[in-house]
Amino acid sequence: MTEFEFGGFSCRAEGSGGTLALLFSGFDRELFADVGGILAQSCGGVTLAEFGDIDWDRDYSPWEAAGTNGRVFSGGADRLVGFLPDIVQELSRRYGEFSRVYLCGYSLGGLFALYSAAVWDFPALCGAASCSGSMWFPGWTEFLREHPIHGDVFLSLGGKEKNSPDPMMASVEEKTMEVKRIAERTAHVVFRNEPGGHFSRVPQRLARAVEYLAECK
């Protein structure tokens, strides 16, 4: 794992290969290492990278919105989207040019990955993955109908996530299926039903998403 500072962000990357998977899961070093360890055994042609530090409710939310129990999403995603061309260029300088780029996120990071795929026009961007993604985010499905995603889309969700006591989050399964139907109009979409709840086997879920997108499995 290589760690470095670039563009005002802390960054980390590991692996080598012509496929880049950018991870959006809160800039957690241990989680990144776990995902990288799995991919090192199964997906040798992938460079895994991420950047932070991250405030989930600010940086991964595409617009301002109110959650439950006073939670506030401040809509800072566009700042990170604007950084994507720069970090890809810097990673290309360090690791060589990438023929394919994928965006892979967890929870609100999954929402951010799909949002970025819808608004970022980049020739090498081939798709995105949302694992246990916050598809319940206010206004998201309406936005997606007007801003199509292309390429490959991987969606996964834990079977118990719909049992959340939070009424907004409890709609996640219904909303994820709605996102699947919308995205299928313009993209190749795969959905995987995972066992457990929102925090079950997170590294494995993210690694499976990368493996699918990078055609390692």
Question: Whereabouts are the PLM-identified features?
Answer:
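Phosphate/oxyanion-binding active-site loops and adjacent basic polyanion-contact surfaces
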Residues: 76-84, 108, 171-172, 201-202
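Alpha/beta-hydrolase fold nucleophile elbow
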Residues: 95-106, 128
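The feature captures the conserved acid-bearing segment of alpha/beta-hydrolase catalytic domains
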Residues: 132-213
